[in-house]
């Protein structure tokens, strides 16, 4: 189940929301898009990237037309991935991008931390969730110690996004994936 928790920078809980419509409304206030998608055809558990793209093509095309995305792909992360620890550490540092960061969770989950102002928004994304983080928004991502997800990603440039780290240690002050998901 998707869940948004909003904290002060010092860690005081302000709001805790589980209703997808309310999550979308709250995130819209900081220009973050949150939607729930459904495939236009049933997907097998071992669906190919092409089958996944085709199942969500109507939604992908809608976002391409609205935001001018130039490319998209499917990324998978499993507990067996040889670089999972290295990638987790990279994503756990607060950063920005000059491009949108768009993820649709086909299956599995992950936690986005958004820090656009004097608050921290912790969003646990689950299968069926789309999040679009606007350019230059401070954020970080935690996929957990044993990641298991498949996502569609969309980009406005063919080379995708490049992280620009802020140097802040704020990510160390908030709960990691395991505590967010199990807490």
Swiss-Prot record:
It comes from the Bacteria. Pathway: Amino-acid biosynthesis; L-methionine biosynthesis via salvage pathway; L-methionine from S-methyl-5-thio-alpha-D-ribose 1-phosphate: step 5/6. InterPro entries: ARD (IPR004313), ARD_bac (IPR023956), RmlC-like_jellyroll (IPR014710), RmlC_Cupin_sf (IPR011051). Fe(2+) binds at residues 95, 97, 101, 139. Its EC number is 1.13.11.54, 1.13.11.53. Pfam families: ARD (PF03079). Keywords: Amino-acid biosynthesis, Dioxygenase, Iron, Metal-binding, Methionine biosynthesis, Nickel, Oxidoreductase. Binds 1 Fe(2+) cation per monomer. Binds 1 nickel ion per monomer. Disulfide bonds: none annotated. Ni(2+) binds at residues 95, 97, 101, 139. Its cofactor is Fe(2+); Ni(2+). The record marks 103 as: Important to generate the dianion. It catalyses: 1,2-dihydroxy-5-(methylsulfanyl)pent-1-en-3-one + O2 = 3-(methylsulfanyl)propanoate + CO + formate + 2 H(+); 1,2-dihydroxy-5-(methylsulfanyl)pent-1-en-3-one + O2 = 4-methylsulfanyl-2-oxobutanoate + formate + 2 H(+). One of its GO terms (molecular function) is acireductone dioxygenase [iron(II)-requiring] activity. One of its GO terms (biological process) is L-methionine salvage from methylthioadenosine. Catalyzes 2 different reactions between oxygen and the acireductone 1,2-dihydroxy-3-keto-5-methylthiopentene (DHK-MTPene) depending upon the metal bound in the active site. Fe-containing acireductone dioxygenase (Fe-ARD) produces formate and 2-keto-4-methylthiobutyrate (KMTB), the alpha-ketoacid precursor of methionine in the methionine recycle pathway. Ni-containing acireductone dioxygenase (Ni-ARD) produces methylthiopropionate, carbon monoxide and formate, and does not lie on the methionine recycle pathway. Monomer. Belongs to the acireductone dioxygenase (ARD) family. This is Acireductone dioxygenase. The lineage of its organism: Bacteria, Pseudomonadati, Aquificota, Aquificia, Aquificales.
């Amino acid at each position: 189940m998707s869940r948004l928790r909003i904290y002060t920078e010092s860690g005081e809980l302000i709001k805790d929301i589980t209703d997808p419509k309310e999550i979308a409304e709250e995130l819209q206030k900081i220009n973050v898009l949150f939607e729930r998608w459904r495939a236009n055809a049933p997907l097998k558990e071992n669906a190919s990237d092409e089958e996944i793209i085709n199942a969500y093509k109507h939604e992908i095309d809608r976002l391409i037309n609205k935001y001018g995305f130039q490319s998209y792909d499917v990324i998978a992360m499993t507990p067996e991935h040889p670089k999972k620890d290295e990638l987790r550490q990279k994503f756990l540092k607060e950063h920005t991008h000059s491009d949108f960061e768009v993820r649709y969770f086909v299956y599995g989950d992950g936690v986005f931390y958004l820090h656009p102002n004097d608050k921290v928004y912790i969003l646990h994304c689950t299968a069926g969730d789309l999040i679009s983080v606007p350019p230059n928004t401070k954020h970080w991502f935690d996929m957990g110690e044993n990641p298991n997800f498949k996502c569609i990603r969309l980009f406005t440039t063919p080379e995708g996004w490049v992280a620009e780290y802020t140097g802040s240690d704020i990510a160390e002050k908030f709960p990691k994936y395991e505590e967010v998901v199990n807490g």
